[in-house]
Amino acid sequence: LTSKLQYGAQPLRRRSTQAGPFLRRVVAAFCENPLAARCTLDCSITPAVETAILHADAALLTRALENVLQNAVRHNAGPIMLAFHADADETTLHLTIQDDGTGYPQSVLAVLNGEPEGESAPHILGLHVVEQIINAHGGSVQFVNRDPHGAKGMMQLPLAKDENEK
């Protein structure tokens, strides 16, 4: 998938998608995953998201969001607090997924921020796929560490612009 996305060989099956119900389905599916037993999840979806329309490949976008949610649990020992927040303005859907775990290793953040990979490059395939999927939808993503600890993924996706995309 990553090679197909990188070279534009993965066709996007875009459909008009109501952001609110779509995001609730993604979060509900995560809650049914056995990994969810290792975290407490706080989900916040603002009213603006309910009327927002994405022109998106729902399966690929689901995969990206699942990767971030599952990574938060997989890469932290013990129970964590996980927060999923969605908001929208007139043009953009803003998603934030954050946890109170150990955060991203600096080597992971360095590679995600475009620094050359060294001989002992970290494993970032899941987060790289997230970047590619969000970018393929015309969006952007940023991964950072929280102070004093924890990880945060911030994603922005364009909303459908006109009736032809809705």
Label every PLM stretch briefly.
Residues 71-73:
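Short helix-loop "hinge" at the ATP-lid/N-box region of the Bergerat-fold HATPase_c
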Residues 8, 33-45:
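Short conserved segments within the C-terminal catalytic ATPase subdomain
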Residues 13-28:
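A conserved beta-strand-to-alpha-helix junction within the catalytic ATP-binding
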Residues 126, 130:
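Short alpha-helical Gxxx[C/S/T] motif in the catalytic ATP-binding
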Residues 79-91:
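Short beta-strand/loop element within the Bergerat-fold HATPase_c
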Residues 7-12, 53-56:
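Conserved micro-motifs of the catalytic ATP-binding
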